[in-house]
Amino acid sequence: MNYTTQMDAAKKGIVTKEMEIVAKKENMNVKDLMKLVSKGKVAIPANKNHKSLDPEGIGQGLRTKINVNLGISKDCYNIDMELEKVQKAIDMKAEAIMDLSCFGKTEEFRKRLIDMSPAIIGTVPIYDAVGFYDKELKDITSEEFLKVAEKHAENGADFLTIHVGMNRKTAATFKKNPRRMNIVSRGGSLLYAWMELNNKENPFYEGFDKLLDICEKYDVTLSLGDACRPGCIEDSTDASQIEELIALGELTKRAWERNVQVIIEGPGHMTLDEIETNMKIEKKLCHGAPFYVLGPIVTDIAPGYDHITSAIGGAIAATHGADFLCYVTPAEHLRLPNLDDMKEGIIATKIAAHAADLAKGVKGARDWDNAMAKARRDLDWERMFELSIDEEKARRYREESKAKSKDSCTMCGKMCAVRNMNRVTEGKDLNMLRDDD
């Protein structure tokens, strides 16, 4: 193999098997895709050690992808349950899964996840550091943090979330500009705490070239984390968030010089009117790199319903440039999600992604909706169920409330507009009073 990474291959004019697969999925010319990869506009996260991967592309002109978060914690240390969640995410065709495990020895779960998953796998190495070394956070050295990142890359993680932009300059800006919610990024808060406790620079920022060595060696995509993402609408688009984004833009160029693919992570909580501007700022400051957003969550008052607040924001964000949506479940801000929460979160996020693809004019996006429209006009209920984003729920709702007329539902009965327009255009009587049809 005469290339190191997908980006290196693209710059050399080499079409990889991963590019061929992605181009076919996206209904696009593989040479056009290769150019986008070479410029960093599209990332194809594909670790050389992830043998079960079915690759996907993330970025300009492609379908909006979704990510599912899962992983073990101290209060919910159940590997079998998390593996059930992995299978649920795979069955529901999530393009990516992030292992956010943050307690104990996580390598066993991570290896099993990567071995079984065709989805892209992302991890956050700093979550693993305390358990990996059995050390307090402040006692972990800069080199040890990098060794954990390398272990995740060696295991086969396709992208690593590293909060490199939380450097001394960003930290100083944060201190000068108080927030209602401080830092709500788990990884960002851990790095900030380590920097404060040790009076040192961010080890990943200081050792960025070594981090790039790791990414280049395994062809790992670097997902530049947003330590200063807003945790409430009052903190959005503030000095800390923008200062960090400027740093991420500079780091992106350094990574591309080393042929390391980059994804930029983004907000967070913000009101509807700020979303489009934030998407444009990221694309400008980070040179068109793919944008990966959590939500955005558009109001802070809906615990138990944040899959809805997130889907609203995600649809708008993806319409205006976001390429990758992290799912949010009804359990957000409350507890670790269960399987039912996962399903609700995945469906809400997939709806947001698809709605944005329609608005962006992604090739082939309308085919699904047009097929549903035809099935509805034909009153072909079986086909409607097959096309539903949640077939099981659609079937159950109709079964629970059956109409006397086989063509209609219990909302309208024989006053169904679709039924009656079909009949009258075919020259048939409406037969409103008879029960025989």
Curated annotation (Swiss-Prot):
Signal peptide: none
Record-listed E.C. numbers: 4.1.99.17
Root EC class: lyase
InterPro entries: ThiC (IPR037509), ThiC/Bza_core_dom (IPR038521), ThiC/BzaA/B (IPR002817)
Protein's job: Catalyzes the synthesis of the hydroxymethylpyrimidine phosphate (HMP-P) moiety of thiamine from aminoimidazole ribotide (AIR) in a radical S-adenosyl-L-methionine (SAM)-dependent reaction.
Reactions catalysed: 5-amino-1-(5-phospho-beta-D-ribosyl)imidazole + S-adenosyl-L-methionine = 4-amino-2-methyl-5-(phosphooxymethyl)pyrimidine + CO + 5'-deoxyadenosine + formate + L-methionine + 3 H(+)
Entry binding sites for [4Fe-4S] cluster: C409, C412, C416
Highest taxon in the source lineage: Bacteria
Gene Ontology annotations for the cellular component aspect, listed alphabetically: cytosol
Pathway: Cofactor biosynthesis; thiamine diphosphate biosynthesis
Any one GO BP annotation for this protein: thiamine biosynthetic process
Family to which the UniProt record says this protein belongs: Belongs to the ThiC family.
Pfam families, sorted: ThiC_Rad_SAM (PF01964)
Protein source organism: Clostridium botulinum (strain Okra / Type B1)
UniProt GO molecular function: 4 iron, 4 sulfur cluster binding; carbon-carbon lyase activity; zinc ion binding
Lineage: Bacteria, Bacillati, Bacillota, Clostridia, Eubacteriales
Name used for this protein in its record: Phosphomethylpyrimidine synthase
List of residues binding substrate: N69, M98, Y127, H163, S185, R186, G187, D226, A227, C228, R229, E265, Y292
Cofactor: [4Fe-4S] cluster
UniProt keyword annotations, A-Z: 4Fe-4S, Iron, Iron-sulfur, Lyase, Metal-binding, S-adenosyl-L-methionine, Thiamine biosynthesis, Zinc
NCBIfam families: PRK13352.1, thiC
Note accompanying the cofactor annotation: Binds 1 [4Fe-4S] cluster per subunit. The cluster is coordinated with 3 cysteines and an exchangeable S-adenosyl-L-methionine.
Residues annotated for Zn(2+) binding in this entry: H269, H333
